[in-house]
């Protein structure tokens, strides 16, 4: 695997191997006074973010540093992009500067794929490119860390019924999760108002529902999504209050879930809209576990791309 641009870059076997690898990194760090492994010593990892981020950016930085990589942050606002430099010139500059990996977030769908083409194949001296979110397209490492969290909470993903709820239309997280979770054997249901479902949702390996209340009792897990108002130009629902009434995860709705069920959210959470504050802080909700798993999962991805599965121990 040269890049991780989409869940389509993985098959079931390689996805499970990444989940297992992430757990091995977690175990390798346990009990260490200094959380450092020599795995990526001498490698240069660059995070290139053209959109704001807390969880994804920080976890990639921590992952790289815990593996002894040299991590360099490139912010669009402080780079030559702000002076009008093209994305291609920026990407080629970072390659020439010695990047072994480029971790890219960009508001345009397909940006990471394009950067991978421009900078060349990883086995021909070009950097490995990791898609950290491209527009409304995909966010593969988020789906992987969500799958890891579900596996830890539920024991297995095979045969589980998992709902993805909310703004599916604008969500790269929904797309990647739908593909990965179904690949791992889950039954995935999208729950959203018709206006927040993409036109091609019927082609995804999912079922579709417009009623959250009808789905909750039969779920093993629910992934709540933020309404991405920054990507909306029109009225997709009458009001925030009505949206919350119909699709928000309230304490009453939380009680409708099975005892073993788990609640996920990729963040940032809009407390009081898609998720009640009490629900966000409940023991059923695995938001902070997702963040922790995000570091280990991204360590596994960096290891797989820059070292490979056969080149030695952690």
From Swiss-Prot:
Q: Where does carbamoyl phosphate bind?
A: 55-56, 105, 139, 142, 267-268
Q: Which GO terms describe its molecular function?
A: amino acid binding; aspartate carbamoyltransferase activity
What EC numbers are recorded for this enzyme? 2.1.3.2
> What keywords were assigned to this record?
Pyrimidine biosynthesis, Transferase
Catalyses:
carbamoyl phosphate + L-aspartate = N-carbamoyl-L-aspartate + phosphate + H(+)
Instruction: Quote the pathway field.
Output: Pyrimidine metabolism; UMP biosynthesis via de novo pathway; (S)-dihydroorotate from bicarbonate: step 2/3
GO CC annotation: cytosol
Per UniProt, L-aspartate binds at 83, 172, 226
- Which InterPro entries does the UniProt record give? Asp/Orn_carbamoyltranf_P-bd, Asp/Orn_carbamoylTrfase, Asp/Orn_carbamoylTrfase_sf, Asp_carbamoyltransf, Asp_carbamoyltransf_Asp/Orn-bd
What are the recorded Gene Ontology BP terms?
Answer: 'de novo' pyrimidine nucleobase biosynthetic process; 'de novo' UMP biosynthetic process; amino acid metabolic process
- Family named by the database record: Belongs to the aspartate/ornithine carbamoyltransferase superfamily. ATCase family.
Please explain the role this protein plays, according to its UniProt record. Catalyzes the condensation of carbamoyl phosphate and aspartate to form carbamoyl aspartate and inorganic phosphate, the committed step in the de novo pyrimidine nucleotide biosynthesis pathway.
Assembly notes: Heterododecamer (2C3:3R2) of six catalytic PyrB chains organized as two trimers (C3), and six regulatory PyrI chains organized as three dimers (R2).
Question: What name goes with this protein?
Answer: Aspartate carbamoyltransferase catalytic subunit
Question: Where does this protein come from, organism-wise?
Answer: Rhodococcus erythropolis (strain PR4 / NBRC 100887)
Q: Which gene encodes it?
A: pyrB
